[in-house]
Amino acid sequence: MNPYRSYDARIIEVKELTSREKLFSLKFLDNEIEENFTFKPGQFVIVDIRGFGEFPISLCSSPTRRPIQLCIRRVGRMTKFIHKMNEGDIIGIRGPYGNGFPMDLMEGSNLILIAGGLGMAPLRSVLWYAIDSGKYEKIYLFYGTKSYEDILFRDEIIHLLKHGEKLNCHVKLAYEVETPSCIYLERGFSEKVCKGVVTDLFRGEEFDVENSYALICGPPVMYKYVIRELLDRGLSPGRIYMTLERRMRCGVGKCGHCIVGTSVSIKYICKDGPVFTYWDALSTRGLI
């Protein structure tokens, strides 16, 4: 696929996940493009709304599954527009872009997925890829959300709380705002659900730090505390991966909108990332 070209895709399903997020399922009009389109978990695409504008968004589905899916939060002019679109409408897709998570490198190891809020979307791609492939030792998912109503992919999360161990997946959930639904969920899964922040979910957990990788995505304020917890447990900076989705525009490193760092170490978020290790963050000013 030409990385500079936008390909037409039909919206085949729109699902409301929360009051602010919708899940868009897509299929390319060109059958050859549809069959050959592939990507790595952690990569992103540029959504092109013809005659209106474009924006970057992570793929939240797994490369092992169809259709391709995008989880889009309604926050600005472009996302408000696409939230008004319906099944059958056509949008443009170009990409995929970015480096993605090094899934091959991590085969045979434990995966510790740590998501906060909307950060669950790109990590969902990793989650189902890891489950489907069966190439990883154990999968942990620690997910922090504001409330029950804000849980992304709620049905999937509850299914994994119930049956995740059968899929070699250990899931824990933290919520901040106490509601009747959260209390009910906590009663049903007292060892897996609690009121608090995502780092509270580490209590009682032990990891083989020599055979584990941590993958983090969430609001910027979360990274500091999660990384500190991981380092305190002995995980090396090179085994801590973060996906940093901010300030991206063109997707190919041409516009310079996402440059961070200094003359000593410059990174393009869209081209060198959006996935970086904590070692990268230590050597590049402004990365986190």
From Swiss-Prot:
This is Sulfhydrogenase 2 subunit gamma. Dimer of heterotetramer of alpha, beta, gamma and delta subunits. The nickel-containing alpha and delta subunits constitute the hydrogenase activity. The beta and gamma subunits (flavin-containing dimer) constitute the sulfur reductase activity. PANTHER family: ANAEROBIC SULFITE REDUCTASE SUBUNIT B, DIHYDROOROTATE DEHYDROGENASE B (NAD(+)), ELECTRON TRANSFER SUBUNIT. It is found in: Cytoplasm. The gene is shyC. InterPro entries: Cbr1-like_FAD-bd_dom, Cyt_c3_hydrogenase_gsu, Dihydroorotate_DH_ele_sf, Dihydroorotate_DH_Fe-S-bd, FAD-bd_FR_type, Flavoprot_Pyr_Nucl_cyt_Rdtase, FNR_nucleotide-bd, OxRdtase_FAD/NAD-bd. Part of a bifunctional enzyme complex that functions as a hydrogen-evolving hydrogenase with sulfur-reducing activity. May play a role in hydrogen cycling during fermentative growth. Activity exhibited with NAD in addition to NADPH. The beta and gamma subunits form the sulfur-reducing component that catalyzes the cytoplasmic production of hydrogen sulfide in the presence of elemental sulfur. Keywords: 2Fe-2S, Cytoplasm, Electron transport, FAD, Flavoprotein, Iron, Iron-sulfur, Metal-binding, Oxidoreductase, Transport. Optimum temperature is greater than 90 degrees Celsius. Activity increases with increasing temperature from 30 degrees Celsius to 90 degrees Celsius. Has a half-life of 6 hours at 95 degrees Celsius. Gene3D superfamilies: Dihydroorotate dehydrogenase, electron transfer subunit, Nucleotide-binding domain of ferredoxin-NADP reductase (FNR) module, Translation factors. Residues 4-103 form the FAD-binding FR-type domain. GO terms for cellular component: cytoplasm. Binds 1 FAD per subunit. Binds 1 [2Fe-2S] cluster. It is an enzyme of class 1 (oxidoreductase). The keyword RNA-binding does not apply. GO terms for biological process: pyrimidine nucleotide biosynthetic process. GO terms for molecular function: 2 iron, 2 sulfur cluster binding; flavin adenine dinucleotide binding; metal ion binding; sulfur reductase activity. Its EC number is 1.12.98.4.
